[in-house]
Amino acid sequence: MIRNSMKSHTELLSWSLLQKEAKRVRLNSDSQPRVVPDSNNYESRKQINCIVYDYSRQRVNRTIIDLLIDLANEVKLPEKIDNLINGKKINISENRPALHTALRDLSNKSILIDGLDIMSEVVSTREKIRMISNRIREKKWLGYSGLPITDVVNIGIGGSDLGPRVCIHALSNYVSKEFNYHFISDVDPASFNDVIVKINPETTLFIVSSKSFTTKETLLNARKAFALYEDRASIDQHFIAVTAHPERAHQIGIKTVLPIWDWVGGRFSFCSAVNLITAIAIGYEQFVELLAGAHDVDTHVQFTDFKNNIPVLMALIGIWNNNFLNIHNLLILTYSKKLEYFVPYVQQLDMESNGKSIDVNGRMVGYATGPIVWGGLGNQAQHSYFQLLCQGTHRCVGDFITLKTNDEHEINSMCHYKMKVLSEGIQTIENPYGYIPGNMPMNHLILSDCSPYTLGALVALYEHKIFVQSVIWNINPFDQPGIESAKSAHREITLSSEL
């Protein structure tokens, strides 16, 4: 059903003025790293606690930033951010809020949905996470044979896998070495078998995470894990479910269930009980630090003016690159082995949220929306796609992420060298084959460290950036109708093949 709406965002005055600016930029010499070099009164470096955001290598100037902020105000972005955090039903297609921010609101202030305060459930679930993680870490959670847990296996896919996986790897300095941590996400038999050969079922805890508890891949692997135990009584000590449908978990024999709610999207469940494995690994106190980092960014995005608002600036400059400079991909390079899994995490978060061609009014959009997100470990790019970045015919935009704690190491100097080459280019008369045009727009995110607090802040930064872009594009980032349609088609094909 098509809803009535105001005029298209492309008809707004700020949009048309940005188009004129973009035309001027495209006519500008490609040898320039940006339209107007930074002056003393043009600040392109912003900071929130543990993260510095530097956009000095973007092709923007003061005029463009001002117009982008005008665009944000024209689409009522301040109101939309307030609606997100205050629990308004902004997930229009499913008629529900998107309240992942409530999961890390440590003030525990009342948030009402249909007259009910959800924070009591959030706080209660946090307490369950604390109790379970403490029991396991204190060796008081025993398997069926009376031995304490030594291995924790996370069974889930998508948001139920990528978020916990990012944490366990990124926070390796905080992770208890008294336990082994494993992940099973794929229906490929090797995914399950590669883990099972490493564990002893007597001392293993399986966490089965599925919001719907109908996810085919997750339930298939859970049933395989059940088969490791002889009777239902044994399952009690070895399985915990995280789901919005506890009755479905109970039906298959899992008694211990932690809730997630329909107002939390799977890909936004980073701060929920879906991340129980992380609380076990780093301890509940450090898990709260993860929540605190994310919550501080929530506060920052809601109350900081747009000229100093890092998620908003990242989003608006992304809009500029995508919709006005027509660069439809985002390369994310992390210069830390600890952040190896951050790129696939953001890839899902961004492309599943904003990979839409139908707006909130049910109409096809007439402009580009979410970019293709790709990337990986930055230094390894030197030996894979760095050649394309230097001299290829495809234009790219980049987010370069470094740790300040690595400033004395070669890894960060490698990053700075690559940013310089890709933005400023290389011109040499002696070797025409070595010409590099440069002018690649890029952000530089400098993390103070790779602590739980900083990781929480980084994840929230990208969550809010993606939400802000969805507002500009007038799309719903909290549903996934394409995926649901594909699932339905798969069920029909499977049913037909069984007839």
From Swiss-Prot:
Domain of life: Bacteria
Source organism (scientific name): Legionella pneumophila (strain Lens)
PROSITE patterns in the record: P_GLUCOSE_ISOMERASE_1 (PS00765), P_GLUCOSE_ISOMERASE_2 (PS00174), P_GLUCOSE_ISOMERASE_3 (PS51463)
Cited CDD domains: SIS_PGI_1 (cd05015), SIS_PGI_2 (cd05016)
Protein name per the record: Glucose-6-phosphate isomerase
Pathway participation: Carbohydrate biosynthesis; gluconeogenesis; Carbohydrate degradation; glycolysis; D-glyceraldehyde 3-phosphate and glycerone phosphate from D-glucose: step 2/4
EC number(s) reported in the record: 5.3.1.9
Subcellular location as annotated: Cytoplasm
GO molecular function: carbohydrate derivative binding; glucose-6-phosphate isomerase activity; monosaccharide binding
